[in-house]
């Protein structure tokens, strides 16, 4: 699924999805949720006006979705891709959540920021909500990012999270399509792994057979610095992090701290949700 607010950023995320999954047979849902547009209308002062404005915005949403669909089919024709348009009167987070569960989505691809978000923020408010609460992998595409095949993938890990096979299969398929190298980066001043960590490391090996795996270790204590340095030094195309309790990502996904941490991500960012569904 690719949520859209019809901004250039949202269309850029859709373009990335079409290119990164160009070898896969996909059903791509392009979804626009428009409740906020209805309630933010200055002329909406009486209940009697609600249905009129809602209908007007609904028709406009459907027109815009058709334009997006025509444009993406024109730019990226692909017989493996089938598209479905969804126009919904609801909040973005609720509509994404409902559609993820109804259609058993494999991934949500969206821009890090929408049309109206503050450019000084790493993530817009809608993207933050989706990253935090949707029980499905989310791939966030930075503003203005020009597509590069994900040949070099950074996957920081402490080898303590019990990963899910379905989400690892997603990474395996993506890496297999592009013969990617996955850099498994262990960030810890203590190099030696416990038996549990060794078992989880082996599980990753077994679950990612299509990729070339590199197991790296850094003794850098600051995780942000470690990740940022590695992205630059190894020319990384895609960053993968796992959203689980007490993880680095959980700390990062706080609106009050995300921009203080300083991880200003300029490459696509895949969040795997360590939640069962």
Model-predicted regions and their roles:
Residues 128, 172, 202, 228, ...:
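Active-site phosphate/pyrophosphate- and oxyanion-stabilizing loops and adjacent acidic/basic residues
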């Amino acid at each position: 699924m690719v949520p859209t607010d019809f901004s250039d950023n949202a269309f850029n995320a859709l373009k990335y999805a079409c290119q990164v999954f160009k070898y896969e047979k996909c059903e791509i849902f392009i979804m626009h949720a428009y409740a906020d547009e209805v309630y933010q209308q200055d002329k909406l002062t009486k209940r009697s006006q609600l249905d009129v404005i809602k209908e007007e915005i609904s028709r406009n949403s459907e027109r815009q979705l058709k334009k997006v669909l025509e444009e993406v089919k024109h730019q990226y024709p692909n017989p493996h891709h089938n598209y479905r348009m969804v126009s919904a009167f609801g909040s973005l987070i609720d509509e994404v959540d409902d559609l993820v569960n109804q259609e058993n989505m494999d991934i949500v691809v969206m821009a890090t920021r929408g049309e109206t978000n503050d450019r000084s923020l790493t993530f817009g408010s809608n993207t933050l909500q989706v990253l935090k609460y949707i029980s499905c992998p989310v791939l966030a595409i930075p503003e203005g990012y020009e597509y590069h095949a994900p040949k070099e993938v950074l996957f920081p890990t402490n080898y303590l999270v019990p990963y899910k096979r379905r989400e690892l299969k997603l990474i395996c398929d993506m890496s297999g399509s592009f013969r990617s190298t996955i850099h498994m980066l262990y960030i810890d001043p203590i190099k030696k792994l416990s038996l549990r960590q060794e078992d989880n490391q082996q599980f990753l090996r077994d679950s990612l057979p299509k990729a070339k795996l590199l197991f790296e270790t850094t003794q850098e204590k600051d995780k942000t610095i470690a990740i940022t340095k590695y992205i630059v030094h190894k020319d990384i195309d895609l960053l993968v992090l796992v959203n689980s309790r007490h993880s680095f990502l959980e700390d990062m996904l706080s609106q009050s701290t995300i921009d203080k941490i300083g991880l200003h991500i300029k490459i696509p960012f895949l969040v795997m949700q360590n939640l069962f569904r």
